[in-house]
């Protein structure tokens, strides 16, 4: 409290940013948009106290799931503001750009779901794949697990090692299933296994799909290339090109 943000992140020391203060002392009249990047369960507390004219953009899981019972099931936390769930929107910008105006709460997707839904949502909408048999092998750097990762692993156990974790029970399964089911309008089956690999950051998701009819790999590639051509942050590699993080 009272220090500049640059004290913790030297990379932004030249930026003019306010000093860190307690949320109780914030003058809400000077704020239009509020970002929260806090542990699960904290953003919903803030959502209850901020004025309704402030847009909350949350990076946690507090408003990702439409059903508070599912949130309790997957995250083990009773939701403190169930009514605000209905006023929130789960938003991957590439798919919900036109729905973001006049929103109260924008919920950002998880890291794995982002990498998985960017290619899958267009294909599910176009009915190009069998949604009852989607296999996802995803690998992530250890920074995605936050500070707690260092309590479970030391450098020696991370180095030259690949570990599968939360097999069949990863929390991100809930939002992947929720969003793909909305689009397909029927029950889907996703087999998702995340892995921790010895690098600091980055995600590589390899997705195995069963296509319908004459939808070859080349046809799917061409469709995704066309679909994302105006999405600035999506870069489509050349067909059959080796890719990595």
List PLM regions with ranges.
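Short acidic/glycine-rich loop or secondary-structure boundary segments that cap or lie
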Residues: 115-116, 143-147, 199-203, 215-217
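Predominant activation on well-ordered alpha-helical scaffold segments within soluble catalytic domains
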Residues: 117-124, 173-177, 221
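Short Gly/Pro-enriched turn/cap motifs at secondary-structure boundaries
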Residues: 164-168, 195-197, 243-245
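Oxyanion-binding "anion nests"
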Residues: 169-200, 204-206
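C-terminal active-site/capping subdomain that shapes the small-molecule cofactor and substrate pocket
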Residues: 205-245
